[in-house]
Amino acid sequence: MATRLANTPQRETGTVIERKEQQLKPPAMYKVVLLNDDYTPMEFVVMILQQYFSRDRETATQIMLTVHREGKGVCGIYTRDIAATKVELVSTHARQAGHPLQCVMEEA
């Protein structure tokens, strides 16, 4: 009879376990979009873009003009949670300032 030492690994026979590599998908991305209205001052929109989306003044002005001319403009593209947070922050700030500015998120 063979004696097995305590630290000797035991050998498995018959079954091979394969490891499958997990393929992680990148998270879904969402556009944060400002919608045009006839009441929110252009300067307020520029300030929102600078404060909440870290846009420089020139870029913020270009986005604001896109919102004004085309009815909506993309502020940035983010993961769902970040986009939802930005929409809520902008909407709350606009409401508190007495402006009807609307901010929404759309799938990118």
UniProtKB/Swiss-Prot annotation:
Oligomeric form and interacting partners: Binds to the N-terminal domain of the chaperone ClpA.
Family according to the record: Belongs to the ClpS family.
Gene3D superfamilies, sorted: 3.30.1390.10
Top-rank taxon: Bacteria
Free-text function comment from the UniProt entry: Involved in the modulation of the specificity of the ClpAP-mediated ATP-dependent protein degradation.
Source species: Cupriavidus metallidurans (strain ATCC 43123 / DSM 2839 / NBRC 102507 / CH34)
The protein's name in its UniProt record: ATP-dependent Clp protease adapter protein ClpS
Taxonomic path: Bacteria, Pseudomonadati, Pseudomonadota, Betaproteobacteria, Burkholderiales
GO biological process: one example: proteolysis
